[in-house]
Design a protein with these regions (language model features):
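Active-site regions of metal-assisted phosphoester/phosphodiester hydrolases
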Residues: 1-113
């Protein structure tokens, strides 16, 4: 629960198999449908760029490459949101952190919820 009330956070690590990861994301979207908003969905989706936002119809809060960690060229890690106000979207502060703990960069988003 945040200062403005309850919100939902979900995380996922989707398959690297093309097509199967999209099916997983669609199933996840259906599962999340009835949960309270605002909702934040984040994780390693193994899907590049804007595909996760298009599949879910959620808002992408991070627009930076995350893979591979030492020279990120493609965004595979995402933070998506549904049910945020325009003000909450506008004030979201996203960052990508190049940490030597994974082959992917870490992603953080500061939200005022």
């Amino acid at each position: 629960e945040g200062g403005k009330g309850p919100f939902t956070v979900a995380t996922a690590h989707l398959s690297f198999v093309p097509g199967y990861n999209v099916r997983q994301l669609r199933a996840l979207r259906r599962w999340l449908h009835g949960l309270p908003r605002p909702l934040v969905l984040l994780g390693d989706f193994n899907l590049p760029g804007r595909i996760p936002a298009r599949v879910t119809s959620f808002v992408e809060l991070v627009h930076e490459p995350t893979y591979p960690v030492m020279r990120p060229r493609v965004q595979l890690d995402h933070v998506l949101a549904d049910g945020l106000t325009a003000s909450e979207q506008a004030t979201a502060e996203a960052a990508v952190h190049l940490l030597p703990v994974s082959d992917h960069a870490a992603v953080s988003v500061d939200l005022d919820l």
